[in-house]
Amino acid sequence: MWTVPPLLIVLVAAAYPLLRVCLESTKVGDTQRGWSTWSEVLASPMFRDALWRTVSIAVTSTAGCLVLGMFLAIVLAFVPFPGSRVVGRLIDTVLALPSFLITLAFTFLYGSAGAVNAAISSLTGATSSALNFLYTPVGVIAAEITFFTPFVVRPLLASFAVLPRPQLDVAASLGASPLRVLRSIVMPEAWPALMAGGSLVLLLTLNEFGIVLFTGAKGVITLPVLIYTRGIVTFDLPGAAVIATVQIALSLMLYGLYRMVFARLMSGRGRGDADVVVEPAK
């Protein structure tokens, strides 16, 4: 009986609105229903371009977050330096900020009238902006990597915190190089956290709207931006609902794929879990 109230809350707060969106996508006119809106939207070159742009930006940003996040987490966890705790707190602070603030900061730094371009102009005497990447897909990807990397760093730091330090010390005392310790001991324990952070970043970048909108990047039309354009600007609610339904299906598919891969990874770890043996250096 205690499971009924939470289930009802989920159905009312999440499932019902999503169902209404899916039903709205089948509306034709005021009273009829059909699939003509689907055919029109899916055949549109703008939709196909937006779908490709959304997936490519999300995958590229996720890859960048994984590489940068792994590097930062390893440095913060295993390479002590003055101010490391402050850096960790700053990374946590980014998690509490809205995404458009990062874009605003990028505008002040790398925009056509930003601090970096002003400094370059003062040094070189150039009259045009030296950096123009902010208003391109590269600028969107850079802003997303900056904003979403902490979502990878935090799970990795939590995973590294529970690593048995004596095991690392023994491996080092036996002559294992830092790279071998990282590959043989650290990385196997970090895979679940890396997958969790990476899958979260992929879903977030796939549905990111604020960064793309605030950069004002020309030609960067993603699915969320296209939903906004058709639903709010042109007030084409059925067309926006079709794109939103595709977005929902894509997100659920990626989440299901993540759960399947994660379950197989954990079951494989359970079957083959054994102490790591590091041979002494010869």
Language-model segment annotations:
Residues 1-29, 45-161, 189, 193-209, ...:
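Membrane-water interface segments at the C-terminal ends of transmembrane alpha-helices
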Residues 27-31, 209-235:
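Glycine-rich helix-loop "coupling/hinge" segments at transmembrane-helix boundaries
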Residues 33-43:
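A short amphipathic helical element positioned immediately N-terminal to and/or at the very start
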Residues 171:
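The alpha-helix within a helix-turn-helix
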Residues 174-176, 188:
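Glycine/proline-centered hinge or cleavage motifs at structural transition points of membrane proteins
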Residues 262-282:
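Short cytosolic juxtamembrane segments of multi-pass membrane proteins
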